[in-house]
Amino acid sequence: MIKTELNYGDVYLVPKKTVVDSRKECDTSVQFGPRRFAMPVYPSNMKSVVSAETCELFAREGWFYTLHRFNVDAVAFTRYMQEQGLFASISVGVNDDTYEQLDALKAAGLSPEYMTLDIANAWCVKAERMIKHIKQHFPNTFLIGGNVATAEAARDLEAWGCDAIKAGIAGGRVCITKNKTGFHRPMVSTVRDCVAAVTIPVIADGGIVEHGDIAKALVCGATMVMAGSLFAGYDESAGDIVEIAGKHYKEYFGSASQFNKGAYVNVEGKKILVEYKGSMGKLLRELQEDLQSSVSYAGGTTLAALREVEMIQVYR
């Protein structure tokens, strides 16, 4: 029998009695690894979304971030961030160049506070080898592994040594994996299954369309939420500005796109133009205000209240 699964657009949250006088009383901070952050959402570690400058901005604002892994000097970035009194959070792959990158970090006496193993399907033998290698050589680094889409995969990544996992395959706006391969799982079902399977934090990665989807992901049990298109198109975002018929746009492309790879090989991503939106400051304020409202509707004062909210399916 074919299973029916759910995405964020298929569900809503049932309001509870509000116990605060003002939404501003609601605390949106989250403990993630060794640090506490202002919000449980952060930009995708994509070359068209974050740059080193974007990451520094988020760190200074008290938000989590992860730098992408494409043509990055991890040694220079880690050293710079730590010299600034900020935390370093980098991404790595599973191929030979990553082992060389890790050797360079170790030779420099550097250990990033956070590291994300970032590949399309982390439920594989190469990821297992890399996770065990990282935990052996960087035991004090908080290691995030991704991406996965099933309970069994999540359990394996925890067993291999990950401190958190990233859940979601082919849910992003510029990801065409589901079109090219037929493989994908809706995010509500993915996150709930992965959360139930492990004892470590789960990051819901992909499928965020509206601000309210962040609250839905947290209700599903996610500790953190990663979003790409939500953070694209701003001054502080990566990507080039393009002018068409007097309007300004920024390029936004997937990590598996031809534009990121530099060649049309195993392409599972595309490039789109998103409207240029100016400064990101307004977005960060709105995201926090909207999540404070979500917490108030959940009948609490902290993000923990969202774990007790009823989720209902809507038929369209």
From Swiss-Prot:
> Where, by residue number, is the active site?
175
- The EC number(s) attached to this protein equal 1.7.1.7
Query: Pfam families in the record, alphabetically?
Result: IMPDH
Which top EC class applies here?
oxidoreductase
Catalyses which reaction(s): IMP + NH4(+) + NADP(+) = GMP + NADPH + 2 H(+)
Disulfide bridge positions per record: none
Q: Does the keyword Magnesium apply?
A: no
Extract the InterPro entries matched here. Aldolase_TIM, GMP_reductase, GuaC_type_2, IMP_DH_GMPRt
Q: Which UniProt keywords apply?
A: NADP, Oxidoreductase
Write out the GO cellular component annotations.
cytosol; GMP reductase complex
User: Domain of life here?
Assistant: Bacteria
| GO MF term (any one) | GMP reductase activity
- Protein function: Catalyzes the irreversible NADPH-dependent deamination of GMP to IMP. It functions in the conversion of nucleobase, nucleoside and nucleotide derivatives of G to A nucleotides, and in maintaining the intracellular balance of A and G nucleotides.
**Which family is it part of?**
Belongs to the IMPDH/GMPR family. GuaC type 2 subfamily.
Name the record gives this protein: GMP reductase
Q: Organism, per UniProt?
A: Chromobacterium violaceum (strain ATCC 12472 / DSM 30191 / JCM 1249 / CCUG 213 / NBRC 12614 / NCIMB 9131 / NCTC 9757 / MK)
User: Which gene does this sequence derive from?
Assistant: guaC
